[in-house]
Amino acid sequence: MNGKRIKVLVVDDSLLFREVIARGIETDPSIEVVARAADPFDARDKILQFEPDVMTCDVEMPKMNGIEFIRRLLPQHPLPVIVISTVSEAVFDAMNAGAVDFVTKPEVQSSKSVEKFLLDIISKIKIAANAKISRSNTADTVNSSAGKINTNKIIAIGASTGGTEAIYKLLKALPAEMPGILIVQHIPPVFSNMFAQRLNNQTLLNVKEARTGDWLESGKVLIAPGDRHMKIKKIGDRIRIETFEGEKVNGHCPSVDVLFESVAREAGSSAIGIMLTGMGYDGARGLLAMRRRGARTIGQDEQSSIVYGMPKVAFDIGAVEKQTSLENIPQVLLAMLK
């Protein structure tokens, strides 16, 4: 934001929450709350009047819910939106509508819960201020009869901000006959299981949240739990999954680096690594380790990334063999599997 304060519009039908959010985020000197709104219609007027850089928006509101509001708003007023929600699958609908990120609503009675919420939303506002607004162009579903696929590989994917929607678009474009896929998405606990169930229902692949003792098999996708690292262990010709609690790595648990480094070590040239949109540098070092051990590697390009952070660092250090748009990644991946 070039040293200027980030202008934020806070939208929530609860006066109490509007005040908690507005006062809390303004404790950060780089953020200025330019307006508050009680409903989407009020918010639309405030957007025109104040031209905010970022909007925070409750999912559950009267007159029009936050998801419908985002769906209608963004084509006319492209604006980074962070949705605030109780623990519910609605956050993924909001991301699909074009929101950049989400934060879980705190218990107002718990000062610890509110404090954690404010730290989280301040961090996400700063990321959102530099984010690109996604247009909902999805990758085309790939014809599953488009040639023989080598399923004796392992695919490892890492993502952060903007990643839930990017992963959905990527997996939706893949046929059922695929090698086993491992995913680390920076996501809170509980939501990781919801995310896995949603992908399982919306794609041709068998998707679940990973558990220690799971075996990676073709057609199966395992997503790291929101508060546990994930790594693999090769036992004979099979791949066993381990998830475990641990210190944050690069500020994250689960960490993409933890997965990628174990894949480099255990699978070597039998793997393909994919780095998708996200803030920071988690996974760059691990992707480089994979490439050095003979793995093929793909990075999402700047144009199609909501936040070109993790893929940029990976590209800059030489970890990315092929950089391309999100829409083109399925084709590149399938070509590598021929």
Residue ranges and their predicted role:
Residues 2-9, 15-30, 36, 41-56, ...:
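Conserved acid/base catalytic micro-environments in cytosolic active-site loops
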